[in-house]
């Protein structure tokens, strides 16, 4: 793992320079997004949600909401950007719900689409968001059990005691994690340890797209709204 300084504070969570370096490959397919997946695991709808940071909220049942910060205009960042967060958070992708983040320059930077820059500019911020959430959950569990964080590990949304039999899910400890201070440093995974990035996942909006569900600006409607168009280019 690689240690990096988070540069976060509690409520302005990620005012970070996201001038990322390095490229990556995330696998997903428009076609698989149109296929029914009978193996998808189900998680009960939470009774309560806990906001861990500006990218992540966790339900008491273990359901995870990850916010995708950049506009989705067909380039599939609404799938790929949350995958980066989920990788470092160490959660089961089948338990993740993706939501489009609102415009909020206090939380996010570079909220635009163009030039194939979304991943490139947000790579560091997305990874740190996931890693910071994971660290806060670990610290909450360590405090609950009165053990060092180094005695704990995570796997797909479950915290385990390395030398014991105790386990606790992210959903069970999330309420305690919201009170944990943002760590000054977090450990990022080595690229060789990626389990989610590089795999093929369905487009999160694939089913909505092929069934005509409202998704885009063109779908917006308000009572009394009038439409206009340009007759010819200015």
Predicted regions and their residues:
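Cofactor-binding beta-sheet edge motifs in enzyme active sites
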Residues: 2-27, 35-234
